[in-house]
Amino acid sequence: LLHRNLIASLTASLFCIPVAHASSDDSCNPPAALRQNAYSCGGMPILSPANDTRINAMLLMVDSGQLAQLFPDPKTIPPKDRVNRIVVPFSYDFSGWIDIGQKQPDTTGNASNANAPSNQYADGEGSICRSMTAGADAFGAALNAAKDLPGDEAARLRAARADIAQKTCASGGASAAWTKPSVKSPIGQQFATYLDGTNAFYRFDFPAATKAFAGASHSANPWLKETGLYMAGRAQLNAAQANAFDHDSPTPSRESVAKVSLDAANTVFRTYLKVYPQGRYAGSASGLLRRVAWLGGNVAQQADLYDKAFAHWSPTVSNVPLMQLANELDSKLVFAPGFDPRQIQSPAVLATVDLMRMRTSDSTDSSRDKPLTLGELQAQKPRFAGTPALYDYLLATWYVYVGHKPAAALDLLPQASGAPLDYFGLSQQALRAFALEDSGQPDKARQLWRDLIPLAKLRFQREALELALAINLEQAGLVDEAFADDSPIQNAAIRATLLQRAANADLLRAQAQNKSTSGTLRDIALYTLLYKEFTRAHYADFVTDVTLVSDAPSDALKPFAQPGAKNEDGYVCPSARDIAAALQQNPADAKGMNCLADFVRRHPAESGLGEYSLPSWAAAGAPPASAAHVPPTLGSAPSQFKGKSFERMPGYVAVMDDAQANPNDRAYALYRAIKCYAPSGYNDCGGKDVPKNTRKRWFNTLKAAYPGSQWAQTLKYYW
């Protein structure tokens, strides 16, 4: 199961948020993109095939304003952490926690606590003893409120209720006999009858419990009347499922479900909800009705009940937290054995399943066994008669994600109205922008992304739109626009990604000196500028720009300001500035090459600076069919910073091959090139792989040609 807190490293937070699948501890890395084709463990605030079905279900069926309040507020991310948190896609687990790096709330007394009495039937009836304590409290309160009940009888009834708990649910107590209290008043006898039912219920004598609770439900006392009816339904439900589960299996054997009792439970709970639509047990009765439908294999009824449960969900009234309800939808319906979506009549639940079936398949995604065809979707149209906009959205989604006919999608999607967007409205407009980009109109999509940002009023909407706009600008080679004074892209993590991955030297230099931005982003810009200049042979620019490092630099910038020194192997290098100056004069300078390699070895680039690695098919030429429509991610466009990144191994080889090089420098280059393979036997210095016989020759050369060098004397092996 998932842990509550998912702490990401800086780079992972920016580019690929590690989160866990809902059903395992395996982590995954969702791309930094609003548009994704395959299943993603990162959630997005738009209806998407890539979303977990539980996220889509909430977006489809829960009021947007209410759902937004359950999402964490990006403003609660501590300012110092915002450069590390891209927010969307957001990581989540289904204990109810969505992690964007926000401050953790005090959960004391939290209404979403899964142990609260109102949440005790989150997964159906479960252990009947779960309701023992809450039931005793409610019974005591009812005794206190009962008129015409003598005090001594109330005391005996209260003691008898406590005795039931001790002799049924307490360890070793189920075999002990219970004595019905002796009371004479009519109201006292009615409460005693209720206790008869309680005792039978907790002893699993459900027929006797049903009879007693039904009798109590005829009382004039409001509590007995309502609670007796509700408990009669629970007794019948437990009777129905008594033999339905074998060996702790979560799946019922429907042949073993007592249908008469199940039908009775269905009738009682529906009667209860009709008589007490706002009753004290209305949330629980609704949840148990879902269990009745599940036990009976009634998919259409299940879907209808889930639709209502999501639509009317409330933290104070519903019997389960919203994300537990989403879990229940998944386990009891969408991924239940033998599930047949053709039986679903609920448009929202059907849409949840349809979106899942539009995913791009991968080897780990079992949800894509039966991809949705256009014919199937068109045949569903009558079931969406009451929700034509949702049907058009699904059809447009199919054309964008599956059929790759963006023009057909554009014909189905509305223009933005200019009003604030709910999550469905955001989904429609985002899909329009995707279709525009796919149809060769990225400029129109870019303007749409810009126009939508002021309409984003709900949590995660603005972050999603800023991400989409940033990707569009990056793909168009317009990264500078993301940093313009009037740019709507304000997310610090998005800006950091663009600086590290995409920006050219001029933009980095400008942002490194931009006093209107945060000190953290200025440091990222300057670090990226200096590291790329130093390692991409922009030596003259480096010598000039290194003067921008302050007298009290951040940790990342300190290596650029350090004086020369002897390293741990005894090799002496000057400062970074002096190394660059030497290489500016002679790019093949042996000591300069060795010292540049040593700088890279001792101060590897921050992970965010890593060049985007193309998939193997991209290097070979045309992509395979499965990769033809892979959407871009933030930081995936070729960097606008000119030059090829320095690699240590080719540098060492160049020094080895330089007949004019100082013997000390050649010996050190040999030593370091050999150690590139230590201790794994794999090259961690870049460049082409070197055969083992060549490494052996290097080792022998070091020993034979430079026997007096400290490196020849200390190196014992080659790898």
Where are these regions (language model features)?
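Bacterial N-terminal signal peptides
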Residues: 8-17
